[in-house]
Amino acid sequence: MRRFIIKILLIAVLPVVAVMLRMLLITDDYSRRSHGVNVRLAYNKLDKLSGTQKIVIIAGSNGGFGFNSKILSDSMRMPVVNTSVHASIGVRMQFEIYKDLFERGDIVIFCPEYYNGKGRLYGGEPLLRIVSTHMPSAYLKMSVKHWQYSLKYVWQHYLEAIEHRGMTKDLGIFAANAINEYGDMAMPREHKPTLIHYGLIGSMDEETAEYYRYIHRFAKEKGIKLVYLPPTFCESNYRTQKANIQMLAKQMSALGIPYMAPPERFVYADSLYYDTSYHLTTHGAELRTKAVLEILREL
C-alpha cells in the first residue's frame, strides 16, 4: 500500500516538476540582447585569467555604471573584471558564481547597493531571467533556502520571457554591445534631469548579514584582499536617507564587517548621475574610480 501511494504521488508530482522546469529554463530575448550577458562574459574572463592576480568588481548596477576599469587596470597594473550587472541578481549568486575562480592575491571590490532586505541576498525575477538565458549551470549553486525564496518568481519570469519573444528593440545603454572589454557599462551618458530615488531601511536582514560575514571569512581563508565599500549614491537621495545609511554602516561595524570608507566618500552631486541614485555618468564613474584607487593604494 505504501509503495502504491508513493507511485501515485510521483505520478502526480513529476508532471508539475517538468512544467516548472520548462517555465524556469525558458530563455528571454530581452536578456539575450541586454547587458545581462556580462554574467557569462565575466565568468569566461576570470576562467582565462587563472594563475594571474587580478581585480574583480562585485556589485549591482552601481558597479556596472560606476567604474572606469581601464583607469583601474592601468593604475594598478592588473587585469580588471567587472562582474556587475543588476542588484536583483542578489549578492549570494553574484558571489557564488565567481568565488571558485578567485585566487590568493586577487583584489575583490565588493560594493553592494544599500537595499538590505532578503531580496538583496537572493535577488528577484531578474536573477531567473539572466541565469536561464546566459548561464543555467549557475542554478546548481543555489541553496535550498535560495530556491524556496526564488520559486515565487518563476511564473513572472515565464510570462515576461513569452512577452519578450522576438524582441528587436534597441536597448541603448543597457544593450549587450554597450559593455566594454572589462565589463563596464561604457556607452557615453550624461545626466538626466530626473533621477529615480530610493527609500532605505537602516537595518540589515539577519540572513543577508550572515552571508556578508561568510564573504569576509572566505576571502580571509583564501588569501583574497576584500575591499568592502559602500555604493555610490547621489547627494539629494543621500540627504533624505542619511540616518538610515549611517545606521546601516554602524550595524556593519558592530557585525565585524565595517565599510573600508565612510558612505559619504562616494556621494556626489546629482549632476554626476545618469538616471538613478546609483548610476553615475561617464565623468562620475571616472571620479568614483579615482576615489577607489586611493583606497587600493593603501592596502
Regions found by a protein language model. Name each.
Residues I55-A59, L280:
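Short hydrophobic beta-strand that contains or immediately precedes a catalytic carboxylate
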Residues I11, P230-T282:
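Extended hydrophobic/aromatic segments used for targeting, binding, or gating
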